[in-house]
Amino acid sequence: MKNILARGGIEFLAVFLGIGLSFYVEQWQSDNEQKDLLVKDCQNILTDVDEDIFTINKIIDSNNIILKACDNIQSIVTSDEVILVDSIILDIKKLTYPTFFGITRSYKLSYSTGRLNLYANEKLVKEISKLYDHFYERLDINSNIYDQVGLKFLDQYVDKNIGYAIRGYDYSSKEIIDFFTNKLFINELITFSGRVSGYLQRLKETKEQLVIVKKLLIDYLAAQNKSEVINWIKYS
């Protein structure tokens, strides 16, 4: 009887250990699969970050040109020198309001699966989250404000009053000079210029965070010691 009980206990223990080992192996395989998928997630996020760095540099350059044109116009219309209408119109034509909206698809996909938070290192998660949940969201808000200010100043005010001159139609120099030297125009220009300057600051801050995230992603991928990952980094 004792032998039967002992044998039964051993069999039960063997079954229990077998189930436990099987569960452990399945969990180990699942974790490895998720980590491999995270590598692909990070590759995709890095591709998005690279594209965003290229785009944000172009937007920064464009807004620097716009800010310089604003400064030129303000200097001309507030000086005592004779206003050269053709010159100021050339600067007015440079005024637009280009905005930046980052690519978020790869980050959102990885975040929705939980892989990023579960398997990536803490610093990488922190900086990626900061980029998308802080810098991009703040920049989206500023982009929308910039759009509204630009629309009001350029489309609804400048274009409405002297659009004909900007488009090359005949104009009276006196009418154009009166428009540019009016205090209303100067105030609107100062408001627009201030918005350009503020938006440029947000762009530069976001670019700095993009560069930080890019470096961390490259370091993380390289640390996986997988030849396909290293080759992807090398030739991307």
Q: Positions of the model-derived regions?
A:
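Long, hydrophobic alpha-helical segments that serve as membrane-spanning/inserting helices
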Residues: 1-2, 6, 27-236
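Hydrophobic membrane-insertion alpha-helices, especially the h-region
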Residues: 9-23
